[in-house]
């Protein structure tokens, strides 16, 4: 499953997403969802302890000036890589 988080972790039920996540699932942080990847934040710590493989969209990180503040556990990816994730994970759920 590919989960996409496009809202701030403070404006969604991140705990619910983490409860249903399984090994082999991917999570892409995009738009305001990249805030969940800030180093040392409660959201980043919770994501790091989850079974999810974590990704964040580079354009959204740069647009918010967060390049130097993203957790090292999160792979920064391009739009092309986003397309590859959708090919890898045919089932998707937006948060």
From Swiss-Prot:
UniProt entry keywords in alphabetical sequence: Cytoplasm, tRNA processing
Membrane-crossing residue ranges in chain numbering: none
A Gene Ontology biological process term: tRNA wobble position uridine thiolation
Subcellular location: Cytoplasm
Main localization (coarse): cytoplasm
GO annotation, cellular component aspect: sulfurtransferase complex
InterPro entries: DsrEFH-like (IPR027396), Sulphur_relay_TusB (IPR023526), Sulphur_relay_TusB/DsrH (IPR007215)
Pfam families: DsrH
Record function comment: Part of a sulfur-relay system required for 2-thiolation of 5-methylaminomethyl-2-thiouridine (mnm(5)s(2)U) at tRNA wobble positions.
HAMAP family, sorted: Thiourid_synth_B
Known partners and oligomeric status: Heterohexamer, formed by a dimer of trimers. The hexameric TusBCD complex contains 2 copies each of TusB, TusC and TusD. The TusBCD complex interacts with TusE.
Family to which this protein belongs: Belongs to the DsrH/TusB family.
Protein's name in the database: Protein TusB
Species assigned in the record: Sodalis glossinidius (strain morsitans)
Underlying gene: tusB
């Amino acid at each position: 499953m590919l989960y996409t988080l496009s809202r701030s972790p403070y404006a969604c039920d991140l705990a619910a997403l983490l409860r249903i996540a399984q090994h082999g699932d991917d999570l892409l942080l995009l738009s305001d969802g990249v805030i969940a990847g800030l180093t040392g934040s409660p959201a980043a710590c919770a994501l790091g302890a989850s079974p999810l493989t974590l990704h964040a969209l580079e354009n959204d990180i740069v647009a918010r000036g967060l390049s130097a503040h993203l957790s090292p556990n999160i792979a920064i990816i391009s739009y092309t890589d986003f397309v590859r994730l959708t090919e890898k994970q045919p089932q998707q759920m937006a948060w």
